[in-house]
Amino acid sequence: YVLISGNHRLNSFKLLKRSNIPAVVHEEDNALVHQLIELEENLSKNSLTVLEEGDHIVLREKILIELGQKSVAGSNNYTKKAMSNATLSEQLKMNKRTYQYKKQVSKINEATKKLIADTKTADNLNDLITLSRQPENVQIEVGKILHNKQARTFKRALLMAKTKFINSTWTKENEE
């Protein structure tokens, strides 16, 4: 058997030295379905940061597309029962706009995500949306600044990063 969800419950029962644990056993042997169930459970908890939530939402959509459960732009949505973004956002109990913003967060450069994962910015939707709209070099620089605690706020880190690249561009133009 493979444990897909309920790890905290399993550990609690082990600590209590109980030999029987109530469980739901699925006969499904599809790894994608297992991954989808795990993602659903993680998204239903409130322990994820906004940064993690965005990645989970995008991965969930990719799996649903592979399983033929999500509608894709350009396909005929009337011939099959595929879910739309509106339906997916309702399932997660969020409005469509918030859902779209959280998906946008996943566009942040992977190296930057790792750098900011343990900062306050990782849980601030507005800051993450702003960061996702920046060029990759600015994103990475903001990540380094926040990770190294060279700035206390996201806005300050963004200003420092943009200034660095404006200064380097200005210097190159003057050398010519």
Where do the PLM segments sit?
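Amphipathic, charge-rich alpha-helical segments that serve as recognition/docking helices
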Residues: 9-106, 129-133
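Short active-site oxyanion
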Residues: 1-2
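Amphipathic alpha-helical extensions and coiled-coil-like segments
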Residues: 92, 96-176
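Short, conserved phosphate/pyrophosphate- and ester-handling motifs at nucleotide-, phospho-/glycolipid
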Residues: 6
